[in-house]
Each structure stands twice: as structure tokens, then as C-alpha cells.
């Protein structure tokens, strides 16, 4: 604990805040190229392998992004769009890939939550 005299001479140093959106440059979405798609096991109580893509963004940052939904069509070096949003049970994964945009297809035959998975509207009978 500093004395009053020390505080008058030097003052207090403010804490530096860490930037949570450093990779995205404050943008809501960011474009990138995916070099590879590994699977990763989640934290303790959960066990299913999570589909995670390492993405090199247009500003040369490398991040890990979650691929939502069942199945995906990732080939070699496709263009993808990234949005924010962490995956609670996967450490270091702070963004999601947007389905149905660029080279990542939406989920076919999906009826509920279609906007989250890039699914087309079903034809009514």
C-alpha cells in the first residue's frame, strides 16, 4: 500500500484492458480462408468431438472458429465468413462460421432455426 506522499508524487497506474475483438477489428463479420478442419474434444463434462476450423482472416490473424450444425462441405482453402460468439466448452474458440454464405453450404432439409444454419425455405405442399 503506497503512502499519501508516494501517491502525490507518482499517482496510480491504470489497468490496461485487453481487447476481446482484436482479431475482428471491431467488425461484425470478417472474411477468411480456411487451411484445415481439425476436431477438438470439449471441456470436462462433455465429450462429443467439436468441428473447429482454423481460419486465416483478411487482416492476417489466425483464429479458431466453430462450424455449427450437423455435417459440412469444407474443401481445401474455401472462403468463409466469420461472426463472433464463443463456444462454452471449447477453450480458445471465440467465433463461429456463418453457414450458407461463400463456400460453406447451409444445412439441407432443415425446418427450424433455418436462419442460423443457412437453410432454404421449404416448398409448401
From Swiss-Prot:
InterPro entries, A to Z:
NA-bd_OB-fold, Ribosomal_uS12, Ribosomal_uS12_bac
Q: Which GO terms describe its molecular function?
A: structural constituent of ribosome
Would I find Transmembrane among this entry's keywords? no
What does the function comment of this entry state?
Answer: Protein S12 is involved in the translation initiation step.
Q: Where is the composition biased (Basic and acidic residues)?
A: 10-23
- Annotated keywords: Mitochondrion, Ribonucleoprotein, Ribosomal protein
Name this protein carries in UniProt: Small ribosomal subunit protein uS12m
Amino acid at each position: 500500500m503506497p503512502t499519501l506522499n508516494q501517491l502525490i508524487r507518482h499517482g496510480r497506474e491504470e489497468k490496461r484492458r485487453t481487447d476481446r475483438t482484436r482479431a475482428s477489428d471491431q467488425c461484425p463479420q470478417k472474411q477468411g480462408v480456411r487451411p484445415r478442419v481439425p476436431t477438438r474434444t470439449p471441456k470436462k463434462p462433455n465429450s462429443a468431438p467439436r468441428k473447429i476450423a482454423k481460419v486465416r482472416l483478411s487482416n492476417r490473424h489466425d483464429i479458431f472458429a466453430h462450424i455449427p450444425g450437423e455435417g459440412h462441405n469444407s474443401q481445401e482453402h474455401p472462403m468463409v465468413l466469420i461472426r463472433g460468439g464463443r463456444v462454452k466448452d471449447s477453450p480458445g474458440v471465440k467465433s463461429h462460421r456463418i453457414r450458407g454464405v461463400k463456400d460453406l453450404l447451409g444445412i439441407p432439409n432443415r425446418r427450424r432455426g433455418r436462419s442460423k444454419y443457412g437453410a432454404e425455405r421449404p416448398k409448401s405442399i
